[in-house]
């Protein structure tokens, strides 16, 4: 998920892939032969969900019919009060099964800071996440994505994150569910920090969800971790990959993210799981942006050495 950090609105319109061009893409490039599989992150359609244009129960069907994608990544914000509602979760399963779509993971937000230096609130945050591990298991997902958010001295925040992730990973291991951290702002966007946390947790059910676009550590002052280096440091622990895209030039390449280079790193680490499309641009509609990102991801995959 995004941090709202793109400056795409300031870019010239002259080299953008037009809305109409993206919407009129014909004959999608077949994904066969790629060293990875493609999924769709629900956040790519967050505007449609927030406005009520789309309903969470329709996500799997919409993904298959509109984009030809058969794997989905949910965001708990769109069914935040349903974690323990097995009737509702059963409907989600049924909708996915009816359309041949596999549920991959749930991205968890707004359940507290897992790296808070306030122990009471941090342990409550850990407790708040347990129900989502249960929900993920019910939905036949393999993973939940959490945020290692916290403020304070670097090492102290890391220690807090290690303790919380250790607790969650132990619970996840019992249920067969991975707990992964996305580089998602603050210390977590510092790949060396997050890799260090992973080393300390040292649990096979704890890992990372590297996001191509979330390496900005702070805005004031602006500080960004090198994305290519960051991806290399996070891939050893990756249990998923988030292919963030913003805006595109006339050749259909992302203007701020080097997709071919990023995907080469993903391949070089032997990753063969799902790569989730997460379109977060403003110049194209959500549907057009998702389609453009899918085409870019496939082209990048087909060009790997």
Predicted feature residues:
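Glycine-rich, proline-tolerant flexible connector loops at the mouths of alpha/beta enzymes
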Residues: 71-94, 148-153
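Catalytic domains of carbohydrate-active enzymes, especially glycoside hydrolases
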Residues: 55-75, 140
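C-terminal segment of N-terminal export signals and the immediately downstream linker at the start
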Residues: 12-43
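Acidic/histidine-rich catalytic cores of soluble enzymes
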Residues: 33, 71-72, 166-264
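Hydrophobic faces of well-ordered beta-strands that scaffold small-molecule active sites
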Residues: 36-42, 70-74, 103-108, 144-146, ...
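Charged helix-capping and loop-helix junction motifs
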Residues: 54-58, 86-91, 122, 126-130, ...
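Active-site acidic/histidine proton-transfer and metal-coordination neighborhood
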Residues: 4-9, 22-30, 61, 95-210, ...
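Conserved, mostly hydrophobic/aromatic
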Residues: 40, 63, 96, 125, ...
């Amino acid at each position: 998920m995004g941090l709202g950090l793109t400056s795409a609105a300031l870019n010239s319109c002259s080299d953008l892939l037009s809305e109409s061009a993206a919407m009129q893409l014909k004959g999608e490039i077949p994904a066969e032969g790629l060293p990875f599989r493609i999924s769709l992150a629900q956040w790519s359609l967050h505007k449609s969900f927030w406005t009520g244009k789309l309903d969470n129960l329709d996500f799997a069907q919409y993904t298959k019919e509109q984009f030809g994608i058969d794997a989905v990544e949910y965001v708990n914000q769109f069914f935040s009060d349903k974690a323990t509602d097995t009737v509702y979760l059963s409907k989600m399963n049924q909708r996915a099964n009816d359309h041949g779509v596999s549920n991959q993971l749930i991205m968890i937000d707004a359940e507290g800071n897992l790296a808070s230096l306030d122990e009471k609130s941090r342990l409550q945050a850990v407790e708040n996440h347990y129900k989502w591990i249960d929900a993920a298991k019910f939905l036949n997902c393999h993973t939940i994505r959490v945020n290692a958010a916290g403020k304070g001295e670097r090492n102290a925040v890391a220690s807090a994150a290690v303790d919380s992730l250790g607790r969650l990973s132990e619970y996840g291991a019992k249920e067969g569910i991975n707990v992964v951290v996305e580089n998602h702002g603050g210390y977590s966007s510092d790949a060396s920090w997050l890799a260090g946390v992973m080393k300390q947790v040292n649990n096979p059910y704890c890992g990372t969800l590297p996001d191509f676009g979330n390496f900005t550590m702070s805005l004031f002052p602006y500080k960004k971790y090198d994305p290519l280096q960051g991806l290399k440091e996070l891939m050893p622990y990756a249990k998923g990959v988030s292919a963030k895209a913003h805006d595109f030039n006339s050749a259909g390449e992302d203007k701020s993210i080097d997709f071919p280079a990023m995907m080469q790193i993903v391949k070089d680490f032997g990753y063969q799981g799902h790569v989730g499309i997460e379109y977060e641009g403003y110049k194209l509609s959500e549907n057009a942006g998702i389609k453009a990102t899918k085409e870019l991801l496939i082209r990048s995959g087909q060009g790997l050495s």
